[in-house]
């Protein structure tokens, strides 16, 4: 009898303990699910009395508020009268890469949504949670890839050489041109393409894509189709009324390379690019990578007032790019391919879209993988406090990756970060260094030290042998 009473008491304590434990856990969980966002760059402190300024948080940083205190400081004015200064301080947590940090900030700099926190031109972007699937017949792969041009694929024996090099050096993916830098289509496609272009598919350099895909898959190589989106000379020639021009005089706008750009507002080009992507998916590619998914560089947006982007829907640049990627993702979902987007390397470190339409959280929320082009040679003098970023591959990649991870921390369904890294020597950069195996290792280590284990090497000539 005594035993039964003791057993009953024991069970009761267990139930009560479980009840309180569950309630405590639920409360903790509930607290962590409510976020606020910083409205500007703000100082962070080690305690509520602001004894030590330990850094800053950028605009739009996601935080949790755990405590609020009113701090009263007494002092005297010049006449000896006692005065009080009241400051409301908030104890918050935020994620710095993968660590949760606890700091204090002044009140008055938080709002409840990211849309409220960002600048006016980004307030209509969609930062809501999106489903990111894994397909049963197309498993995700942690990519360690090489860019392989269509010419390398078509050149007799070269693809075999690159496959052997990949096997020996732990490379498991090739990024292959499907729609190239001038808008050329690289393998024969169906008549569906003819609705959008008369000449882009006339002389494809890869005569038969089927044996290429088979060879890649037989050798365990994950196949990614690179599709250049809005830099398209062929489409521009066929559709001169869709290119970006100067408002006064109608002259075609070009960057320093002399190439014209089609506006990213052109929905016919959206459809064309996605139709090409569907052809690639049907051919057996595992993933579609959209490159040049941006507006052309316009001197930081200073030229926007004199350029005609043919913006009939009155969208911002960032809205157009996000809507394009969203459209592509929806259209390609039934083909069970993953979607990735290439963006400028410094987008993760920038508080805006760099006047390109590439706003980090907007792009990352839409695609499966985001590939910032983190070539150290492409970072200007003094960026990240480095005199010559090209000569500091580890530090450049580390800081750029860190900033990118922290931008991902602001949204619920971010893309996996898979940077492009430099496999070439930038002889045009003053103070540059020669790149070889050690510089590749430095870049990979910088990412790995931050938990990023996917990357792609870019060499425009595909001469990768000297980098391993």
PLM feature spans:
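Active-site-adjacent "subsite" loops/lids of carbohydrate-active enzymes
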Residues: 135-153, 230-279
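Aromatic-lined carbohydrate-binding/catalytic grooves of carbohydrate-active enzymes
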Residues: 169-204, 297-304
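Glycine-rich, aromatic-flanked loop segments that form ligand/cofactor-binding clefts
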Residues: 173-178, 205-253, 289-291
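SH3/SH3-like (including bacterial SH3b) beta-barrel domains
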Residues: 46-59
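Aromatic-lined carbohydrate-recognition surfaces of secreted/lumenal glycan-active proteins
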Residues: 224-231, 289, 317-356, 412-424
């Amino acid at each position: 009898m005594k035993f039964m009473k003791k057993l009953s008491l024991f069970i009761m304590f267990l139930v009560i303990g479980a009840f309180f434990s569950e309630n405590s856990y639920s409360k903790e969980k509930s607290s962590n699910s409510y976020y606020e966002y910083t409205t500007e760059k703000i100082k962070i402190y080690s305690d509520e009395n602001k004894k030590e300024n330990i850094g800053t948080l950028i605009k739009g940083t996601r935080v949790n508020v755990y405590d609020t205190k009113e701090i009263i400081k007494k002092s005297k004015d010049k006449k000896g009268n006692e005065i009080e200064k009241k400051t409301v301080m908030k104890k918050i947590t935020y994620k710095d890469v993968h660590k949760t940090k606890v700091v204090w900030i002044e009140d008055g700099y938080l709002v409840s949504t990211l849309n409220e926190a960002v600048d006016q031109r980004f307030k209509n972007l969609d930062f809501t949670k999106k489903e990111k699937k894994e397909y049963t017949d197309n498993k995700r792969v942690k990519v360690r890839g090489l860019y392989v041009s269509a010419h390398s694929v078509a050149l007799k024996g070269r693809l075999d050489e690159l496959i052997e090099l990949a096997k020996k050096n732990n490379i498991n993916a090739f990024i292959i041109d499907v729609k190239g830098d001038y808008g050329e289509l690289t393998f024969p496609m169906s008549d569906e393409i003819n609705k959008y272009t008369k000449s882009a598919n006339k002389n494809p350099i890869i005569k038969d894509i089927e044996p290429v895909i088979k060879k890649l898959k037989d050798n365990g190589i994950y196949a990614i189709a690179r599709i250049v989106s809005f830099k398209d000379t062929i489409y521009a020639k066929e559709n001169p009324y869709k290119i970006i021009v100067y408002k006064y005089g109608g002259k075609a706008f070009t960057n320093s390379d002399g190439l014209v750009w089609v506006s990213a507002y052109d929905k016919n080009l959206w459809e064309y690019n996605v139709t090409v992507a569907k052809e690639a998916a049907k051919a057996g590619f595992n993933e579609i990578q959209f490159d040049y998914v941006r507006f052309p560089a316009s001197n930081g947006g200073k030229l926007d007032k004199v350029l005609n982007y043919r913006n009939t829907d009155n969208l911002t640049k960032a809205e157009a790019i996000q809507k394009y990627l969203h459209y592509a993702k929806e259209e390609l979902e039934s083909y069970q391919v993953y979607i990735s987007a290439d963006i400028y390397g410094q987008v993760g470190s920038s508080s805006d879209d760099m006047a390109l339409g590439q706003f980090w959280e907007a792009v990352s929320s839409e695609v499966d993988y985001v590939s910032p082009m983190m070539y150290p040679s492409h970072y200007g003098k003094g960026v990240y406090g480095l005199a010559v970023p090209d000569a500091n591959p580890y530090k450049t990649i580390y800081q750029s990756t860190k900033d990118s991870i922290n931008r991902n921390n602001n949204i619920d369904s971010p893309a996996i970060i898979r940077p492009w890294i430099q496999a070439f020597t930038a002889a045009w950069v003053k103070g540059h260094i020669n790149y070889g195996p050690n510089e590749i290792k430095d870049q990979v280590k910088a990412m790995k030290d931050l938990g990023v284990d996917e990357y792609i090497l870019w060499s425009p000539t595909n001469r990768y042998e000297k980098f391993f």
